[in-house]
Every structure is written in C-alpha cells, then in structure tokens.
C-alpha cells in the first residue's frame, strides 16, 4: 500500500475538503481520466483496490497513471479508551479529494473498456466519479 517514506510531523490536522479543486484538473498523461464529482478522503487501500482493477482490465497494451498519493496521517484512538490522553496513533494514510480532481488516467484502451473501469472504480470510492476524455 502507498505511504510516505518519512514525514516531518507524524500527527497532523485533517485538511479541508470544502470548495472545488484548483490543481489536477486537466489530463496530463493519458487519453481518459477518472475525475471526482464528489468530495471525501481516499485512503491507501482504496487506491490499491483501484490500481488492481485498472491493471486487470487494461491488459498488456494499455497504461495507467495514479495521480494522487496518500500523504496525510489519519489517527484513531483505541477502542474503550477514556477521553483525554492526547491524540491517537496514526491508523492509515489518506488523500483529501475535492470535486474536479483527476485521480487516475488511462491510455491504450477503447472507450467501452474505459467506461467499464470507471464504473468499477466508482464502486470502490466513497464519492461519485466520472470518465473524461481528451478527444
């Protein structure tokens, strides 16, 4: 799973996901992109699940790019622990997604396959996504 090699601070505040995305709005590498319509936090397990879907469905001729990286720690206190005692330990790594962010890009596939991949990826993420194309 994806995670940073090292970070300056182990525990951080959660970033805001209000408003629209200002970066990562255009296709940079592939012919098709999977763009977020909703907002939410994507963790490294979700990204890995989407990567497996793309790798299985693209085949040997296609190529894919992952344009997001989980570099924010998500902390959680253990179960049945009383209030206080500081912030919990990091549990997973997340990436905050706002509407408009292109998360994955594909090339070397036809439009039907790209639509199928976008549909499968939409089931794995906690918000709605759509397929965009360069053409």
From Swiss-Prot:
<dbReference type="InterPro" id="IPR000114">
    <property type="entry name" value="Ribosomal_uL16_bact-type"/>
</dbReference>
<keyword id="KW-0820">tRNA-binding</keyword>
<dbReference type="InterPro" id="IPR016180">
    <property type="entry name" value="Ribosomal_uL16_dom"/>
</dbReference>
<dbReference type="GO" id="GO:0019843">
    <property type="term" value="F:rRNA binding"/>
</dbReference>
<protein>
    <recommendedName>
        <fullName>Large ribosomal subunit protein uL16</fullName>
    </recommendedName>
</protein>
<dbReference type="Pfam" id="PF00252">
    <property type="entry name" value="Ribosomal_L16"/>
</dbReference>
<dbReference type="GO" id="GO:0000049">
    <property type="term" value="F:tRNA binding"/>
</dbReference>
<dbReference type="InterPro" id="IPR036920">
    <property type="entry name" value="Ribosomal_uL16_sf"/>
</dbReference>
<dbReference type="GO" id="GO:0022625">
    <property type="term" value="C:cytosolic large ribosomal subunit"/>
</dbReference>
<dbReference type="GO" id="GO:0006412">
    <property type="term" value="P:translation"/>
</dbReference>
<dbReference type="InterPro" id="IPR047873">
    <property type="entry name" value="Ribosomal_uL16"/>
</dbReference>
<keyword id="KW-0699">rRNA-binding</keyword>
<comment type="similarity">
    <text>Belongs to the universal ribosomal protein uL16 family.</text>
</comment>
<comment type="subunit">
    <text>Part of the 50S ribosomal subunit.</text>
</comment>
<dbReference type="GO" id="GO:0003735">
    <property type="term" value="F:structural constituent of ribosome"/>
</dbReference>
<comment type="function">
    <text>Binds 23S rRNA and is also seen to make contacts with the A and possibly P site tRNAs.</text>
</comment>
<dbReference type="InterPro" id="IPR020798">
    <property type="entry name" value="Ribosomal_uL16_CS"/>
</dbReference>
<keyword id="KW-0694">RNA-binding</keyword>
<keyword id="KW-0689">Ribosomal protein</keyword>
<keyword id="KW-0687">Ribonucleoprotein</keyword>
